[in-house]
Amino acid sequence: LKVNNNSRFTNLYSSNEVIRIPIAHAEGNYYVDKKILKSLKDNDQIIFSYCSENGDITKKSNPNGSLLNIAGVTNKEGNVVGLMPHPERVSEKVFNNIDGIRFFKSIINYHNY
């Protein structure tokens, strides 16, 4: 996933950082109409995008046909998030990947200001 770190859910990631978080959504994908998509982009609400290991956003790196490779979005206020990846599945060292822990720590970090 490529991260947009401009949210209370992703503020501890680097800008455009590429992370590995598993998905488990069968045939689900993200779709909205053009008006909502424009609003999401204009308001910087897309916080996760499916990408290659190098951070390239391509059709090949999109596992489910999600519109614009979208994997996670926030509402306009930035206090609600919806995402397909499961950061809780990579938030402890026992999983051999802790890319997800910063998702949760970002929320704490935001509220400790």
Tell me what each language-model feature is:
Residues 1-113:
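Amide-donor transfer/coupling interface in amidating biosynthetic enzymes
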